[in-house]
From Swiss-Prot:
DNA-binding region: 68-91
Purpose of the protein: This protein is an aporepressor. When complexed with L-tryptophan it binds the operator region of the trp operon (5'-ACTAGT-'3') and prevents the initiation of transcription. The complex also regulates trp repressor biosynthesis by binding to its regulatory region.
GO molecular function, one term: DNA-binding transcription factor activity
Organism: Cronobacter sakazakii (strain ATCC BAA-894) (Enterobacter sakazakii)
GO biological process: negative regulation of DNA-templated transcription
Family (UniProt): Belongs to the TrpR family.
Keywords in alphabetical order: Cytoplasm, DNA-binding, Repressor, Transcription, Transcription regulation
Listed GO CC annotations: cytoplasm
Subcellular location: Cytoplasm
Protein name in UniProt: Trp operon repressor
């Protein structure tokens, strides 16, 4: 292994640990009803809007009534963002997909 790849592996591990720390903190904030102030503190208005758009992308992909190009026009998102959402949804565990369908689609009926 080269020094560069060792550094990259260590950096990836640190990044993963930071992500898991964030997830744990977010869970604790929900348990203490502090999730909205925490997310407002950590995310810019643009980042919050982007997350909302990503949820809409997943929702519409699950619904299956619009093409990716139609989603691009409807949501103002880039085609690459929509394609990543589609690919991620295809790779998602079945139980997550089922839960998302229930939360995003059936909750509206």
């Amino acid at each position: 292994m080269t020094q560069h790849s060792t550094y990259s592996a260590a950096q990836a591990e640190q990044s993963n640990q930071e992500w898991l720390r964030f997830v744990a903190l977010l869970k604790q904030s929900f348990d203490n009803d502090l999730h909205l102030p925490l997310l407002t503190l950590l995310l810019t208005p643009d980042e919050r809007a982007a997350l909302g758009t990503r949820v809409r992308i997943i929702e519409e992909l699950l619904r299956g009534e619009m093409s990716q190009r139609e989603l691009k026009s409807e949501l103002g998102a880039g085609i690459a963002t929509i394609t990543r959402g589609s690919n991620s949804l295809k790779a998602a565990p079945p139980e997550l997909r089922q839960w998302l369908e229930q939360e995003l689609l059936q909750a509206q009926r």
